[in-house]
Regions:
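Residue-level detector of functionally pivotal "anchor" positions at catalytic/ligand-binding pockets or at interdomain
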Residues: 246-263, 333
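Sec/Tat signal peptide C-region and signal peptidase I cleavage site
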Residues: 15-19
Length: 333
C-alpha cells in the first residue's frame, strides 16, 4: 500500500483488526526487476469504509520487495513490516521479527498470515510466508523462489493449488501472470464466506512496480474496492486490466521485435547498448530503487561507462514518456 495511506491508517484505524478471508500473491520478476502484488477478499469498502477493500493488505517497495499482511489485519504490523524491509531485513527475518514483536503482543501472531518477497543485494529473489495456527480454516500458503501465495477461510487447499498452477503456467509479463493467478481462484466461495454471494470475493486488486517507481505512483495499480451483490470482483478486475493494457503506448513502428541489446552482461568498466529507435534515454536503478545513472541514447550502438559500485542494476530504456524495455545489468567494475 502507498506509504501515505498506510500512515493514515495507523492514526485512523489504530487497534482495529479483521479476520478477513483473503487469498493473495506477492511476486518478483528477476529479469525486469518488477515487483507485484495481487489479491482478493470477502472484505470490501462497504463493510469497512476507508479500507478500499482487499488492497489494504498490500505494500510494495519499488526495487526492493512486497509484503502482504492478512488475517486479523493490523495497521501497526503492516507499518512495522515495511520498516524492517527498508532496514534491509530478508523476508524470513521480517516474519521472525513480526512474530516476536506483534502489535498486540503475546501469542497474537498465531492469528496472522504474511507473505513477503524481495531481491537480495545480488539481485536474487527471496520469499517467505507465515500462516499462524489461529487463522481460520481453510488456511495455508505456497512458496516458490520468486513468489508467495497465501490464503485463509478458503474453500480448501485446491484454491491455492489452482492459483499456483495458473501463475507458473502463464506466459507474458508479471502482471499477466498475477492476473492468471487470481483467475485460478475465480470460483464461487473461493473465500468461503462469499459462497452465499455466488462470487469468489467482494473486492480485488493487482499492482506492479517497476524499478524507479515512486511508492504512490506505481506502473500498474488497479483496484475493485466493492461491487453490487452477485458481481464477481476478479472478472471486473480482469476487464479493468484488459482496458489498461490497451491504453499502453503501442510499440514504435517497425521495431516491435527489436529488443534493445545490452552486452557484455555481466559487464566490467563499460558496456554497449544497441537500440532501434532514433533516440532514447537510459536510466540505471539500484536495488533500492534509486537512480544512479542517466544518459541519452542514439539509434545503433552506444558505449556506456557508468561510475557506479559493483552490484545488480535495472536498466530502464524509454523514449520520451514511453517505456521501451527494462533489462537487468550485473556490474563488476
Amino acid at each position: 500500500m502507498k506509504q501515505t495511506i498506510l500512515l493514515s491508517f495507523l492514526i485512523f484505524m489504530s487497534g482495529q483488526f479483521w479476520a478477513q478471508d483473503t487469498f493473495s500473491i506477492v511476486a518478483v520478476d528477476t529479469i525486469t526487476g518488477e515487483i507485484g502484488s495481487a489479491g482478493a477478499s470477502c472484505l470490501d469498502n462497504i463493510q469497512f469504509p476507508g479500507s478500499n477493500g482487499a488492497i489494504i493488505i498490500s505494500d510494495i517497495l519499488p526495487g526492493r520487495g512486497a509484503i502482504h499482511t492478512q488475517s486479523y489485519w493490523h495497521a501497526t504490523n503492516q507499518a512495522n513490516a515495511r520498516l524492517r524491509m527498508e532496514e534491509g531485513m530478508s523476508p524470513d527475518q521480517i516474519i521472525a521479527w513480526l512474530k516476536a514483536n506483534d502489535a498486540q503482543g503475546g501469542f497474537a501472531w498465531v492469528n496472522r498470515q504474511y507473505g513477503v518477497v524481495d531481491f537480495d543485494a545480488q539481485g536474487h529473489p527471496r520469499s517467505a510466508a507465515l500462516t499462524g495456527n489461529g487463522c481460520l480454516d481453510w488456511k495455508g500458503h505456497r512458496l516458490g523462489t520468486n513468489y508467495a501465495i497465501q490464503g485463509n477461510i478458503l474453500l480448501g487447499p485446491q484454491i491455492l493449488d489452482s492459483m499456483e498452477a495458473r501463475f507458473l503456467a502463464a506466459t507474458g509479463s508479471l502482471s499477466d501472470r498475477l492476473m492468471a493467478c487470481l483467475q485460478g481462484a475465480n470460483v464461487p466461495g473461493a473465500d468461503s464466506r462469499c459462497l452465499q454471494n455466488g462470487t469468489s470475493s467482494l473486492s480485488a486488486f493487482v499492482r506492479v512496480a517497476k524499478p524507479g517507481d515512486a511508492d504512490d505512483n506505481l506502473w500498474l495499480d488497479l483496484n475493485v474496492p466493492s461491487l453490487p451483490a452477485g458481481m464477481e470482483p476478479i472478472d471486473s478486475l480482469q476487464r479493468l486490466y484488459d482496458q489498461w493494457k490497451m491504453t499502453l503506448n503501442s510499440p514504435v513502428p517497425h521495431t516491435q521485435n527489436m529488443t534493445p541489446v545490452l552486452a557484455p552482461n555481466p559487464a566490467s568498466g563499460w558496456f554497449m547498448l544497441q537500440i532501434f529507435t532514433e533516440q532514447a534515454q537510459l536510466e540505471l536503478f539500484d536495488l533500492a530503487g534509486r537512480q544512479v545513472f542517466r544518459q541519452e541514447l542514439w539509434k545503433g550502438d552506444n558505449k556506456l561507462i557508468p561510475s557506479i559500485p559493483a552490484g545488480v542494476y535495472f536498466a530502464r530504456i524509454q523514449s520520451g514518456q514511453k517505456l521501451l524495455h527494462t533489462l537487468r545489468l550485473i556490474w563488476q567494475p
